[in-house]
Amino acid sequence: MTKPYVRLDKNDAAVLLVDHQAGLLSLVRDIEPDKFKNNVLALGDLAKYFNLPTILTTSFETGPNGPLVLELKAQFPDAPYIARPGNINAWDNEDFVKAVKATGKKQLIIAGVVTEVCVAFPALSAIEEGFDVFVVTDASGTFNEITRHSAWDRMSQAGAQLMTWFGVACELHRDWRNDIEGLATLFSNHIPDYRNLMTSYDTLTKQK
């Protein structure tokens, strides 16, 4: 049976950045490190561009998982920041769940490290509580492709939608006429080839 197309709505969405920690990032092998960090920061930038409530959380950061990556702290200095003392599933942490529910949003855009644990566990828990969950696959990382696909299968079968940060941005924006320069700048900052495209566009526009 075909599932209905549930679109992301910028007025009903929140972003959850789960366990993007220095130690855990060293485990990511299914995406090249530089590309992965770029994707994570791109997701952060689109959250700011669309004014989406954003929640940061870490797990056992005083241990080997390490602290939240500095760039995310810098992006969201005033965002709710839940340092979980030991809960592996972020949804098992009362403060985290309270912060999520306090946004008043039904759609949750989730990314994190590692995919099959730090993303999958809260995603499945949120679905069980009636949220629409959108997993940002290229801003989530894990050990290898086998592990990644196992996590994707589990989440998608439970009802999560798997998307990329670029797809998320486009679906939230809906129409280029809403803001050409703003969205193009977001893309250009994180996709080198898109920067070339916009340079060409700007040149042609100025010639008219």
Question: PLM features: residue spans?
Answer:
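Active-site acidic carboxylates
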Residues: 1-86, 102, 132, 149-156, ...
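Glycine-rich phosphate-binding loop signature in dinucleotide/nucleotide-binding domains
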Residues: 99-106
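Acidic, metal-coordinating catalytic cores used for nucleic-acid/nucleotide bond scission
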Residues: 60-63, 87-90, 115-119, 144
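A contiguous pocket-lining binding segment that forms or flanks enzyme active sites
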Residues: 107-165
